[in-house]
Amino acid sequence: MTLAVMLQGTASDVGKSVLVAGLCRIFHQDGLRTAPFKSQNMALNSGITPDGKEMGRAQIFQAEAAGIAPDVRMNPILLKPTSDRQAQVVLMGQVATSMDAVSYHQYKPRLREQILAVYQSLAGEYEALVLEGAGSPAEINLRDRDIVNMGMAEMAQCPVILVADIDRGGVFAAIYGTLALLQPQERARVKGVIINKFRGDVALLRSGIEQIEALTGVPVLGVMPWLDVDLEDEDGVALQAGKYHRTDRRDIDIAVVHLPHIANFTDFNALAAQPDVRVRYVRDPQALADADLVILPGSKNTLGDLCWLRESGMAHAVEQARQRKVPLLGICGGYQMLGETIIDEVESGLGTQPGLGVLKTVTHFAQHKTTTQVQATLGTNLPEWLADAAGLHVSGYEIHMGETRREAGSPPLLQLHKAGQSVEDGAISDDGLAFGTYLHGLFDSDAFTRALLNGLRQRKGLAPLDSALEYARYKTRQFDRLADAMREHIAIDKIYAIMRQHQEPLC
């Protein structure tokens, strides 16, 4: 019978996703076939499974921690906000529809049977499942139709561990208040608490822990310190909180424009891990002044973010950077914005809109969504400063609802190899300083990333660095560091005991 445990939080961004990854790593290290599961995820960071299905990035990196390939069953429902009130609904890896919050809340009960079937299929293949909730289980206005917190725990008949973030303050009130707002049968499922992101001497917490255990009857299983572990974040909360705001100087300064609807900012984790690079997410046009490379990232609302670029003055700042001969890269939505024209008769109804005019491309939005993993080769017609990247093999994935065509004579950036065919992708500007592509995950390819960075170093008169960071090994070390820290600070033996004690047959 499958062992299972669910991590729920007192709020969003308390560290559930990272701790789930840590448990997946620990169980994997202990020889258990383990998989993560989150019934419903709301995030703009998504990725593609080997069979071309779209799912949340959090469950992808949790699967990596467990030593397995991502499977869309690990995240059957993905909600991708397109505005403050509307979200694209992705079911089992494919776009189903778009809904506002009220409509989706009414629709959720229809999904319960499908969620349970998916969960049961995973339970039949794995020895341990680590479930993740969303936000807080104490959202009493959503309780009656819940499918991701206590509603999911009930379906899976699994115990719950509550995660609380002490760094934001009020941790004991958050624990007590969350438990107080749960129904008795829900509260009975909570078998432990983990206090996360602690800075300081844990002895100072001892009396508080004793009191909260006495008040609630729920044991505190551990206090996790604030860890400097480089793992992916689930959504834009970390960007808003300034987690990625770096002030230290590095040889290469890369400015990623922080679009209002930024998507897949995990593209730049591999860049940020490089020893000679500072990656900044910027909204102030003046912040582009010192950049050695400007990146327009992916977007879930290309035309809305293009409008913001102009209204905020960022488009003018990008043009000024171009005049200073600063290289410019657009990825996915950012690539679309760099073109001459965007024709949208599908999403916004805005019709034909001018792009930034940097690349000689025209984009037509379409109903069909391209979702695929691809292998690719860099073109041989790259500009001199990027010549070391010519012919290199890279890999990544595509997620976009649109097709971009180049003008005749405008060179592509990549040759994509998919379904037995070679397809041109991306574009390069006439001056060789601006380029775009639909390929996400490009910087995970070590040789390309080092070639790009050495090209930027050359432009600054700096000597190249010979060795490339092996990003896959780097991530593995981060997973192992996380697991080591959790074994040190959390009673993992008690978590095993909780899981074994509450093994129940699925309904």
Curated annotation (Swiss-Prot):
PANTHER family: COBYRIC ACID SYNTHASE, DETHIOBIOTIN SYNTHETASE. Catalyzes amidations at positions B, D, E, and G on adenosylcobyrinic A,C-diamide. NH(2) groups are provided by glutamine, and one molecule of ATP is hydrogenolyzed for each amidation. It comes from the Bacteria. GO terms for molecular function: ABC-type vitamin B12 transporter activity; catalytic activity. Pfam families: CbiA, GATase_3. The active site is at C332, H440. HAMAP family: CobQ (MF_00028). Disulfide bonds: none annotated. GO terms for biological process: cobalamin biosynthetic process. Transmembrane segments: none annotated. This is Cobyric acid synthase. It comes from Klebsiella pneumoniae (strain 342). Residues 251-448 form the GATase cobBQ-type domain. Belongs to the CobB/CobQ family. CobQ subfamily. Pathway: Cofactor biosynthesis; adenosylcobalamin biosynthesis. InterPro entries: Class_I_gatase-like (IPR029062), CobQ/CobB/MinD/ParA_Nub-bd_dom (IPR002586), CobQ_GATase1 (IPR033949), CobQ_N (IPR047045), CobQ_synth (IPR004459), GATase_3 (IPR011698), P-loop_NTPase (IPR027417). Coiled coil: none annotated. Keywords: Cobalamin biosynthesis, Glutamine amidotransferase.
